[in-house]
Amino acid sequence: MMKTSAIHSPFEAPNTISLVAGTGDSNNPLNAFDMSLLKSGIGNLNLIRISSIMPPKADIIPLPKIPQGSLVPTAYGYQISEIKGETVAAGISVAIPKDKELCGLIMEYECVGGKKECEDTVRNMAKEGFEMRGWEIDEIISIASEHTVENIGCAFAAAALWYK
């Protein structure tokens, strides 16, 4: 009789999460995006875009010092506009379950509009995600950025996952 064992991932699940946000304005969309990353503190990292799941028991902490060039799992939202005077926003929320054995949810949202609208929306998205799962929320943490375009502008918000 063959023994079966659990399948193990070759990747270790991150155990910290940091919420960051920033804005940028430049003469082209990519540099506006890059400036927003720099202002959020993650501009010199290689972001690996992930879906919106926070590993169980991960701690929410201020952004740690991560070596430049590191591959960093990140959920993020951003809004770019080339319309001078237009206001753009991006937000991210993390819903933490009461049952600490469950994963948390990361929700990202971006819009043409203001920071309050964006942050309210992204928090409601987290609530709905928990309702769909039938889980109870312990806490929702969120952050958002807002930018009024001068040339080409970008609002950015992210949840960067890392390791203790």
From Swiss-Prot:
<protein>
    <recommendedName>
        <fullName>Pyruvoyl-dependent arginine decarboxylase</fullName>
        <ecNumber>4.1.1.19</ecNumber>
    </recommendedName>
</protein>
<dbReference type="Pfam" id="PF01862">
    <property type="entry name" value="PvlArgDC"/>
</dbReference>
<keyword id="KW-0210">Decarboxylase</keyword>
<comment type="similarity">
    <text>Belongs to the PdaD family.</text>
</comment>
<dbReference type="GO" id="GO:0006527">
    <property type="term" value="P:arginine catabolic process"/>
</dbReference>
<keyword id="KW-0670">Pyruvate</keyword>
<dbReference type="InterPro" id="IPR002724">
    <property type="entry name" value="Pyruvoyl-dep_arg_deCO2ase"/>
</dbReference>
<feature type="site" description="Cleavage (non-hydrolytic)">
    <location>
        <begin position="51"/>
        <end position="52"/>
    </location>
</feature>
<dbReference type="InterPro" id="IPR016104">
    <property type="entry name" value="Pyr-dep_his/arg-deCO2ase"/>
</dbReference>
<keyword id="KW-0456">Lyase</keyword>
<dbReference type="GO" id="GO:0008792">
    <property type="term" value="F:arginine decarboxylase activity"/>
</dbReference>
<dbReference type="InterPro" id="IPR016105">
    <property type="entry name" value="Pyr-dep_his/arg-deCO2ase_sand"/>
</dbReference>
<feature type="modified residue" description="Pyruvic acid (Ser)">
    <location>
        <position position="52"/>
    </location>
</feature>
